[in-house]
């Protein structure tokens, strides 16, 4: 570590209990996407205590700025740091002392940790404005779990002046203390779809007089997998998953209507576009073949998350200096979980780091995200906060 990194890291360590308290507060009081009003208020309260100017963004999000007082040659740089803040509609089944107090809702994806770590980073950065020139933009993004927030923040113009973007995500399948930072594809795109199939009802004993929407839907489900296995290069990363199917009204009536919902996930914009076009064609033509019709509705949750090569190399340099070679992972299997921080990177070159939060000695920290027993090893909060702080300061100083 450099002398500056050592100083900043010591401050992050000293604030560990503060960040843990914040994280546990957010964990006890989870709020779903676009409902994060109390969370927003708690963030604002902490920023007020720190004397950091802020405003609301994307309805339930928070935007803040910290301007450095150091001087530099040339145009000062600007970086945006991001944390997502929404929870999930899951009933928590484990029983930590900070268990969710809201029935049917919990932080099962680490967003409570991201939120707390960014507040902790803001506290350190604000106390060390003399160490950097330029400006740090802080965004607490709502609604990530439903593909909301990122685009709304971008469209507000809040991050237009940024030259770099940086975000983190807890990773239960990475040991606490380690960081994953790799260039290029990290996360798949996420597109939601609903296919409605229209048939013709009739008595089950006279199938020739009806058009069986349930049968058509089942054929679409099976055929959709051939778009992956028979229409896509085996080395390309594509997933088509169907999670719900509903059809018919009773046992002895041919289903007149059927509906299914699912997701398409791809690692490149080209493959994403191709898969969506082919699935829509398949659904409509399959329905027509059996005398029915189909319509497909889409919602874009997230683009493929592609870490910028230069920004990732910069963040890797910071991470290597902070944590050492053995704790920085620069290549691993890509994830089919999406994150609309991808929109930030498309707007402002940036990097997204996975922060290890799993500890085999604490089994709940190793279960998958979106599990009712999910938890994090809170030592990961220090790693996340240190990354936010040190990468931002070093980028603004032109040291990475």
How would you name each of these model-derived features?
Residues 26, 64, 81, 111, ...:
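Divalent metal-coordination and catalytic microenvironments
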Residues 80-82, 91, 193, 352-358:
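Non-cysteine beta-strand/loop elements that form the S-adenosyl-L-methionine
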């Amino acid at each position: 570590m450099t002398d500056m990194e050592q100083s900043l890291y010591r401050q992050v360590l000293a604030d560990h209990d503060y960040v843990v308290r914040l994280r546990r507060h957010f964990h006890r009081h989870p709020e779903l996407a676009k409902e994060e009003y109390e969370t927003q208020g708690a963030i604002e309260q902490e920023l007020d205590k720190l004397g950091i100017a802020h405003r609301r963004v994307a309805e339930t999000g928070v935007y803040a700025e910290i301007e450095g007082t150091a001087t530099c040659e040339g145009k000062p740089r600007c970086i945006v740091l991001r944390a997502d803040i929404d929870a999930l509609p899951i009933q928590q089944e484990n029983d930590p002392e900070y268990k969710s107090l809201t029935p049917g809702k919990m932080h099962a994806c680490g967003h409570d940790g991201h939120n707390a770590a960014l507040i902790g980073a803001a506290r350190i950065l604000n106390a060390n404005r003399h160490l950097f020139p330029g400006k740090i933009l802080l965004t607490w993004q709502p609604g990530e779990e439903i593909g909301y927030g990122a685009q709304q923040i971008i469209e507000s113009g809040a991050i237009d002046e940024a030259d770099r973007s940086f975000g983190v995500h807890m990773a239960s399948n990475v040991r606490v203390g380690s960081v994953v930072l790799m260039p290029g594809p990290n996360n798949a795109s996420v597109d939601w779809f609903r296919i409605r199939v229209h048939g013709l009802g009739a008595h089950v004993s006279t199938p020739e007089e009806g058009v069986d929407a349930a049968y058509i839907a089942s054929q679409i489900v099976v055929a959709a997998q051939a778009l992956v296995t028979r229409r896509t290069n085996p080395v390309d990363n594509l997933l088509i998953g169907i999670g719900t199917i509903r059809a018919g009204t009773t046992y002895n009536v041919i289903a007149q209507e059927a509906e299914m919902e699912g997701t398409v996930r791809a690692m490149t914009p080209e493959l994403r576009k191709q898969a969506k076009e082919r699935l829509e064609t398949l659904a409509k033509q399959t329905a027509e073949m059996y005398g029915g019709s189909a319509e497909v509705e889409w919602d874009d949750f997230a683009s493929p998350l592609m870490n910028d090569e230069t920004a990732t190399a910069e963040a890797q340099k910071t991470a290597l200096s902070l944590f050492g070679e053995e704790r920085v992972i620069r290549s691993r299997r890509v994830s089919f979980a999406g994150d609309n921080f991808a929109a930030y990177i498309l707007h402002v070159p940036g990097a997204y780091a996975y922060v290890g939060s799993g500890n085999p000695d604490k089994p709940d920290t190793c279960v998958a995200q979106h599990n009712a027993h999910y938890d994090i090893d809170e030592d990961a909060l220090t790693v996340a906060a240190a990354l936010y702080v040190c990468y931002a300061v070093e980028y603004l100083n032109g040291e990475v």
